[in-house]
Each structure stands twice: as C-alpha cells, then as structure tokens.
C-alpha cells in the first residue's frame, strides 16, 4: 500500500471518505478543483480511500517562509491505530524535504484528542492563538 496523490478515478471513494470521517458532503467539482490547487494524498485499500490529507502550499510574504497548510487529515474508523496516519505523514515529510517547506500548520477541533496526541508525537506544537471566523451568506 503506497501513499500517492489522489487520482480522478478515486474521487467517488474520496468523497465517501470525507463523508465518513468528517461528515461533509463534497461535490465532485469541489474535489476536482482541490486536486488542481492542492496536494491530496491518499492511502487506499482495495480501491477504497482509507486515509488522506490535503496540503496547500503557501508563503509568508513578510518572513519569506514556505509552508503547507494541512487539512482533512484523517483515517476511517475501522483502520485507526494501524499506522496509516503515520504512513501518510511520512509521505508529507518527504514532500516537505523535497519542496523545501519550512513548516506545516493545521487547525484541529478541540474535541479531536486522539488527533492531538498524534500531532504531539510528530513534534507539532500548539500555537498560542485564537481563530476567529466570520461567515457571509
């Protein structure tokens, strides 16, 4: 099982993955657009996406630091605690080195304690900040 970029043929499986792990219905168009503008890594078993992460590359214009913003990092419930998140993250680390990325940033809900434990084990630190959001209809 190899971690690789999501392919067009895997969009439906990925949509099911997002629904199962995060509870969101995502359209084929939105996934297709994300595939053009982001790196979506997936781990599949029998053509089913069981783990994934999305990386968006950006650059701090003041400090000149390149970074990945990571989102939708998860593993299907039946496949947790089997090393698949680590396998995905190992691939991310390869890309960090290859693309000379300075750091990875992610946001995680307060209730995701198991994920927070994983991040800590992989040397992420909590950034002392508060996130504000304003929605427009």
PLM features: residue spans?
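Residue-level recognition of the GNAT/N-acetyltransferase active site
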Residues: 76, 109
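Conserved GNAT acetyl-CoA-binding A-motif
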Residues: 89, 96-108
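Acetyl-CoA-dependent GNAT
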Residues: 5-65, 71
